[in-house]
Each structure stands twice: as C-alpha cells, then as structure tokens.
Design a protein with these regions (language model features):
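Long, Pro/Ser/Thr-rich low-complexity/intrinsically disordered regulatory tracts in eukaryotic proteins
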Residues: 1-137, 144, 152, 164-166, ...
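Active-site His/Glu-centered metal-binding helix of metallohydrolases
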Residues: 148
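Short glycine-/aliphatic-rich beta-strand segments at the starts of folded cytosolic domains
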Residues: 154-160
C-alpha cells in the first residue's frame, strides 16, 4: 500500500475578511450578497462554478453539500450565507461563515504543496475583487484568534487502523503535538472508521510554506508509524484481521440492507484486508462509490428505501 492509500485527502482552508464590511457576526444584511457576487465574479472567469444561496437552497442540496464537506453547519444557519462550488467539488468558497470569505481546497492523497499553489492563485484572484483585511504586523485579521496571521489551516485525512488497533495512536499524537499539530477523529467514537485529520494549530508567526512543511513532517511521521504498526499487527493478529476483513468484504457484497455507518466500518476493514492481500478489490473506486451512497447523496437520487438502495448498489458494483 502506498502513502496515498494511507493519506486519503488533503485540504487547505483560507479565512479572510473584507475591508469596509463588518465581520460576519455583525454582517446580517444583504451586504453579504455583494461580497458573494464579487467572489463569484472572480471565480467565474474560469467557468465551472455554481453559486448557492443558503436562503434559497433546498434541504436536499444543503444536506448533500454539508455531507461532502463543501459547506459547514455554521453556514447553513446564516440567512445571508452563500457558497460557491466548483463543478468537480475541489474548491468551495463560503461567504458569511465565521469569516466573510472562507476558501476550501481539496485534493486526493497527500498533495498539500500542489494544493497550496492552486489556493494561492485563486486567493489572489479573489483579492483583486475584494480587498482583504490585512494588518502589516499581524497578517490577515479573522474572527477567531486561532486563524489570525496566515489565516491558513492545512490538513490531511489519514487512514490509521493499525495505530488505533495497537493502541499506539495516542503516543503518536503526543509526539506531533510538539509541532503544534493536532490529530482528531473524523467521526465520533461510535464509528470505527479509523480516519483522522492532521491539522496545524498555529497560524501566527509562521509563513504558509512553514505550515505546509510542519504538517507534511507530521503526516510523514504518522504514515511511517502506521506502516510499522501494520507489520506488527500482522505478526500478532493475522488470523483475526484476516477473518474480520473477509467477513466485512463478504457483507458488503451480499447484504440486503445497510446503514451508512455500517458501510463505512465494513469498508475500512475491507480496505485493511486489501492491504494485506486477504481480499481483492479496487479501494479507490470503492471509496468513490461509498461517497455516492451517503444519506444525503441517496436522498438526492430519489431512492425509496435508503438502506436497501445502498446495499443494492454495493452488490452491483463489488460483485
């Protein structure tokens, strides 16, 4: 398994406020739409972007965008909030969220450096239309003190089942915390998906390049630790892992009904089994399939019974 099988997704978030406008906590009128129009105009030069206004958005579309991480819960509660999303969903810009402009950039695997180049180019284009609040000493001014400075958070989502199963994750988290890097589970404790987000905590006093470097070092450390833990796991628990991964893959291919939580947990065990060669399937293709079978995505597709439809599609695609 390559590093990109452990590193699932990279994300860069840039938080900005606009000169001459109140911060979102006080911007509760149609002036937020003026900002949205300016940002959309800057992005629309390249085409392929769609503007969504929260007040005019259907519940199904709102849930789908939220499920895919393209908008936040906070934005959905903003009556003057908007989102501008690229057709391939690799770029999402939220307007009137915690800050006036919150840019999100997504990429597969560990690709922070390339993603930052893309983010910088688009941020510069937006900056030509909207003058950002910038202090010569402090940097970008944001609503939350944790974002002041670069206004940038760089994160990578990692699949770390062996570190979790061997109880080694906490010690790894402690070691990278010295770099002001946090590790947080993507899901709550009730879901055993073994997905964790690695993110910088410091935005002030560091350049964007230094942040990318620090997060990259933490990610590399965790990938090496996961690879070592997988070798140890095979030595200590091969029969248990083989059995659980084969059962998981068998259920994915044969169940009549399946919840989204069960699907995620089974996929993660099947993916670990694929790493060891216990089962054989295209994990990347399956990951795309699973994204299309989350609750809001299925509701948008108009399926009568969500769990029956999910299991039917898994049987169809995996057999």
């Amino acid at each position: 398994m390559s590093a990109n099988d452990i590193a699932v997704e990279s994300k860069i978030t840039l938080s900005r406020n606009v000169k001459g406008y109140p911060f979102p906590s006080r911007l509760r009128d149609t002036r937020a739409n003026v900002i949205a129009s300016g940002v959309y105009e800057a992005l629309a030069r390249d085409g392929g972007y769609e503007l969504y206004k929260i007040a005019q958005m259907s519940d199904d579309i709102c849930k789908r965008l939220r499920e895919r991480g393209l908008i936040s819960d906070r934005l959905t509660e903003s009556p003057y909030g908007s989102a501008i999303v690229s057709g391939d969903e690799s770029v999402s810009v939220m307007i009137n969220e915690e800050d006036a402009v919150v840019e999100q950039y997504f990429g597969k695997g560990e690709c922070l450096s390339a993603l930052y180049e893309k983010a910088t180019a688009i941020d510069d284009e937006i900056g030509k239309k909207e003058e950002f609040c910038f202090h010569p000493r402090l940097g970008y001014l944001t609503s939350c003190p944790d974002s002041v400075g670069t206004g940038m958070h760089a994160s990578v989502t990692l699949f770390l089942p062996a570190l979790a199963l061997t109880k080694s994750l906490q010690s790894c988290a402690s070691s990278v915390s010295r770099l002001n890097i946090s590790i947080n589970s993507v899901y709550d404790d009730s879901v055993e998906a073994y997905l964790y987000t690695v993110t910088n905590q410091q935005t002030l006093g560091l350049s964007e390049a230094e942040i990318i470097d620090l997060v990259g070092k933490a990610v590399n450390h965790l990938i090496e630790a996961e690879e070592k833990a997988r070798r140890m796991l095979k030595i200590s628990s091969e029969s248990q892992v083989r059995d659980k991964s084969m059962r998981a893959f068998g259920l994915m291919k044969n169940a009549y009904k399946m919840s989204a939580t069960e699907m995620m947990e089974l996929y993660c065990w099947a993916k670990l089994g694929a790493y060891y060669g216990f089962v054989s399937f295209d994990t990347e293709r399956a990951a795309s399939l699973i994204k299309s079978l989350m609750p809001a995505a299925i509701n948008t597709a108009g399926a009568a019974d969500e769990e029956v439809y999910r299991a039917e599609m898994l049987r169809k695609e995996l057999n």
